[in-house]
Amino acid sequence: MTMETISQQQTKFIGHRGCRGTYPENTIEGFKKAIAYGTDGIEWDIIVNKDKEIIISHEPFIDTTYCQPLNKEIGFTKKNLYEMSTDEIKLIDCGGKFYERFPNQEKVIESKPLLVDVEKELLGYEGIVLFEIKSEPSLVTEYYPNPKEYADIIYNHVKNSPLKLNYIYMSFDPEILNELYTLMPKERYVLLEYNPFKCFSKLKESLNFTPHAFGLNYKIITPKFVHKSHKENIEVFAWTVNEIEMSNELIKIGVDAIITDYPNLIKHE
């Protein structure tokens, strides 16, 4: 892909964790609703549990701001998902509790799904799936497997996945991306970053390969960064954009994908 090809592409719109603004995040129904809004793709987050199964979840722990036990009398006996079995995780409701940050979110009892179950429900889906791998070096062994083991778990699952061709792998942790690239050098990867002081060259140097894209907090994206990325055939993804005016500004400077909690509002005109 050349710089000219990149610049001619239409900006893509991606539903962040499904459609978090209106439906509980990282749920099968949320992904389906985002797709129904006409998005170019959806984004989800993955972690690994005690059984070494891949769970769709943004946090490696139970976030009580939006999750609650199905049985309130028993409550939570554990909160670290890496120490919990699949059956234990099914007893967590992450949709029925009022979520102050997203007051218009539909309230429905929803559990954190297994990746394999999401894939079955989305069989035949042709859009993009941004497959974000949650990992923090300081939390490895306590909340996450080490990067090599983590990459092996992901690889052994996705190599036979019906959505394999849809996936674009993302992470804030360059080490997990480097490990995955060793196993799957033909796949697409996105390095995520929120630090405004991390320059283009430092981002590139953290990887052993040239990524498909850099995914930046929209507040730190500049026309200069977009131009420099495109010059090296690297796309730029913006997260998380929830205002139409900001979306339009990012489109003007050539951002390739906009990730939003409100795919019902931030979309193709």
Name every feature range the model reports, one short phrase each.
Residues 1-269:
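Phosphate-group recognition and catalysis centered on beta-loop-alpha active-site segments
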